[in-house]
Regions:
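Residue-level detector of alpha-helix initiation sites
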Residues: 18, 22-23, 47-48, 115
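Conserved phosphate-binding and hydrolysis motifs of nucleotide-dependent enzymes
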Residues: 20-25, 168, 297
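FAD/FMN-dependent oxidoreductases across multiple families
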Residues: 140, 157, 239-321, 328
Length: 392
């Protein structure tokens, strides 16, 4: 069959093609609901599927969904009711043993990604006409003047006017259309496992334990419902390489020997294996657009460098991408000039805070005395409130 010329090429099958059905992709699809656009959402996995993560769902993520549609937030709570723990407090322990408890006013919860992501995708099924293609890994992505073309591992190519890359830290879309070298100074690695029978852990409290030997990181203990705990340890990749750290070994050692954790884990049972994951940190200059493409969430390196969470940034950036997708499709303009406002919008909404959090993280990691000073200051309520605002 002869190759079609550009003039004779058929129009793209879809208006918007979203790669990745996690929080960023699902939020983008939800925000495109009712737009009249032909939207397809593809993912390499079949849901429900596990995703290695800390499982914390911060309040800004829930606020963003509620602003989009209050019904979404209410239904999400109902769908995750059997697999979540509402959080009221974060308990932080310094390397020297000081402790601070921060009580949160806005709703937040912990929920295994196996269930949370599945619930978000269920909202997409209920409330939009999005075509959802699961079990659809992609081999290649290319952009031309007229369309973007995604080649699945099996089946026919998918074409669209605009591509939204929401396919995570190891994004195929970003790697092929907006390649960026790994910068270990702006990347964290972590391991996590699930445990049962963990002692002295209030159901509404998440624990963060900072270590003297590994300052650009922390150990966490998060209840996720049903007596299950997400337990992990992560740190800056630059320090991992320099110190030759084995994260799994450190996690086991900390749980066995740390004075705050060892008594609580003496009778604990690990469920399944320890798994690792990477976290591309926000606050840098990584591109958020590529030819006919917008990047969201972890694919755009939007993880909070100070706190390590990324679901809120993923959902917010997915919604912003949908807003700009509507504009581009309405104007039939997918030029770099038309896509640039998306990057500027993400920078205004998220980038400035992420940049501040990155430099705070670096400062605290290199100045141990400052960490202890912050814990001391946090004993006083006015200073504690100021620190909470500073850290977002």
């Amino acid at each position: 069959m002869p190759e079609l010329s550009a003039a004779a090429a058929p129009p793209p099958i879809y208006d918007v093609l979203i790669v990745g059905a996690g929080p960023a992709g699902a939020a983008c699809a939800l925000a495109l609901g009712g737009s009249g656009l032909r939207v397809v959402l593809i993912d390499k996995a079949r849901f429900p599927r596990d995703k290695v993560c800390g499982d914390a769902i911060p309040s800004p993520a829930l606020k963003a969904l509620r602003r989009l549609n209050p019904q979404y937030a209410d239904e999400l709570r109902a769908l995750t009711a059997a697999h979540r723990t509402d959080m009221a407090c974060s308990r932080l322990a310094s390397p020297a043993g000081a402790e601070v408890s921060v009580y949160w006013q806005d709703p937040a919860f912990n929920s295994p990604r196996l269930h949370f992501d599945h619930a978000l995708l269920e909202l997409v099924r209920r409330h939009t006409d999005t075509i959802i293609l699961e079990d659809c890994p992609i081999r290649n992505v290319e952009a031309t003047l007229d369309e973007v073309r995604v080649l699945p591992a099996t089946g026919a190519p998918l074409t669209a006017r605009l591509l939204v890359g929401c396919d995570g830290a190891n994004s195929v879309v970003a790697r092929q259309l907006a390649p960026w070298p790994l910068d270990r100074a702006r990347h964290c690695a972590a391991v996590r496992a699930y445990y049962t029978n963990v002692q002295d852990t209030p159901a509404t409290t998440s624990d963060f334990v900072f270590l003297s030997r590994h300052r650009a990181g922390y150990c966490w203990v998060f209840p996720v419902g049903g007596g299950l705990f997400n337990v992990g340890f992560g740190m800056l990749s630059e320090d991992i390489a320099r110190q030759q750290v084995d994260l799994k070994v450190v996690l086991d050692e900390v749980l066995a020997t740390h004075p705050r954790l060892a008594p609580r884990f003496r009778q604990a049972q690990r469920q399944g294996k320890v798994q690792g994951f990477g976290l591309p940190l926000g606050g840098g200059r990584r591109p958020l657009t590529a030819p006919r493409t917008l990047l969201c969430g972890d694919a755009a390196a939007l993880i909070d460098p100070l706190q390590g969470h990324g679901i809120d940034q993923a959902i917010i950036s997915g919604i912003l991408a949908a807003e700009h997708a509507r504009r581009c499709c309405a104007a039939d303009d997918f030029s770099p000039t038309a896509l640039a406002p998306y990057a500027a919008h993400v920078q205004r909404r998220l980038g400035r805070d992420l940049a501040r959090h990155y430099w705070l993280m670096r400062l605290l990691a290199r100045a141990p005395w400052l960490v202890e000073a912050a814990f001391t200051a946090a004993q006083f309520a006015p200073l504690r409130r100021w620190l909470v605002r500073l850290m977002g």
